[in-house]
Amino acid sequence: MTTPPALLIAGHGTRDEGGAEALRALVRMLGERHPEVPVAGGFFGAPAAPLPLGDAVDGLVERGATRLAVIPLLPAPTGPVPDALPSALERAAERHPGLGYACGAELGPHPKVLDVLERRLDEALGGGARRPEDRARTTVLLVGRGAADPYANAEVARAARLLWEGRGFAGVETAFVSRAVPDVPTGLDRCRALAAASSARRPGRIVVLPYFFFPGGLLERLRMQAEGWAAAHPRTEVIGAEVIGPEAEVAEAVMERYRATVADDPLLSGASCGCRAAADARATDGTARRTAAAADAGER
């Protein structure tokens, strides 16, 4: 029986042990659900990450893997991906001649990810059965990492629109922790303006929703910025929501990306990764296409 390509989950670097444990939990979940597929995960783009991507590659090779389908665990394409992820994979492949790999698309605002974001909002509002008016007086600030790449920032705006559609919230605004505007305080100002439409007897409130998969330094910076703004605006209720986390829906979305990557490049032959080339070859829906052929054409 032929062993299927291994699944390598690539998270953007964190030095936070909580983020590393969340990735481990997702890897365990996928391994339990799909025992036929070798699974590992690691971080790229940050020195001294607790789970280096290269170690994850080494571990899969030790388990007999010769082909890898790499899925970037990112809510949106970020600036470092076109360089940092292929570079990390190339360094790992140099240690393992003959290793083949192909890079799939990031998760983005996948419907299953949106389901988790909606659940995080309900949890922040107290959970349980809620009346439509509870959402109607709630404005959401969806906060992304922020990048120099405008396509990455546009993906956050797209996620905000999809999250708002049909869910009954007063509005969903966007902000970024760094490297892009609006920043968190400006985003909260915009949410406050939307909330001002609520009656004086039932004032509006803001839920700050991190568009991150795992906890880490970015989440801490976001919380500090939101808490500072809230302290300066005591009449506005500001509630912090949790990160997406290693949920079953995330595991399902990862497997969808895995299957699509294998189907697009069934042989997964040759050490190639289209993450760099994809920055200039985006699909019409805004998703970056990553193909081995594109990488072979100009990224050797």
What feature does the model see in each segment?
Residues 1-300:
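Active-site-proximal alpha-helix that buttresses catalytic centers in soluble enzyme cores
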